[in-house]
Amino acid sequence: MSETQVTWLTQDAFDRLKSELDELVGNRPVIAAKINEAREEGDLKENGGYHAAREEQGHLESRIRQLQELLRTAKVGDVPTEAGVAKPGSVLTVRYDDEDETEKFLLATREEGAHGDLEVYSPSSPLGQALLDAKEGETREYELPNGGTMKVTLVKAEPFTG
């Protein structure tokens, strides 16, 4: 059994996701009514309205479960203030395999970074896991999807300021 992944969220992101969840839960009766109306039209095999409503219900329930799990495992708090160390909620500048170019991204969940201009990488991704708790100047190695490995150096870690 795998251990539960804790997700760091600001209070604003938590509130935004909670509002979305409340709205989706409130829409359940509307979708159920659509399904019942379509069901009353007769033959379900060729009932496009029924199938569309069932598909909509499936998407709704999937998102509800996703949000419930995310909020259940959320660690709500302020942006990490510790500069120089890679933590969820930090903006990281990294260099891959001694290349000259650097990349800058937010180490957070997609939900947390949904309103920013930065690329967002999850702390549970291979890159995110490799960089967690790394100090500036430290080089780590992580596994690529194709099975190869890549070295990445943390150039800078700073608190996310929005």
Curated annotation (Swiss-Prot):
> A single GO BP annotation from the record?
DNA-templated transcription elongation
Question: Which InterPro entries does the UniProt entry name for this protein?
Answer: GreA/GreB_C_sf (IPR036953), TF_GreA/GreB_CS (IPR018151), Tscrpt_elong_fac_GreA/B (IPR028624), Tscrpt_elong_fac_GreA/B_C (IPR001437), Tscrpt_elong_fac_GreA/B_fam (IPR023459), Tscrpt_elong_fac_GreA/B_N (IPR022691), Tscrpt_elong_fac_GreA/B_N_sf (IPR036805)
Task: Give a yes or no for keyword Transcription in this entry.
Answer: yes
Bilayer-crossing residues are none
Coiled-coil annotated residue ranges, if any:
50-75
Q: Which superkingdom?
A: Bacteria
SUPFAM superfamilies with a match to the protein in the record: FKBP-like, GreA transcript cleavage protein, N-terminal domain
Q: Does the keyword Transcription apply?
A: yes
Which is one Pfam family of this protein? GreA_GreB
Cysteines engaged in disulfide bonds, as pairs:
none
GO MF terms here are: DNA binding; RNA polymerase binding
Q: Which UniProt keywords apply?
A: Coiled coil, DNA-binding, Transcription, Transcription regulation
Q: Which NCBIfam families match?
A: PRK00226.1-3
Q: What does this protein do?
A: Necessary for efficient RNA polymerase transcription elongation past template-encoded arresting sites. The arresting sites in DNA have the property of trapping a certain fraction of elongating RNA polymerases that pass through, resulting in locked ternary complexes. Cleavage of the nascent transcript by cleavage factors such as GreA or GreB allows the resumption of elongation from the new 3'terminus. GreA releases sequences of 2 to 3 nucleotides.
- Which protein family is it in? Belongs to the GreA/GreB family.
What is this protein's record name?
Transcription elongation factor GreA
**Protein source organism:** Saccharopolyspora erythraea (strain ATCC 11635 / DSM 40517 / JCM 4748 / NBRC 13426 / NCIMB 8594 / NRRL 2338)
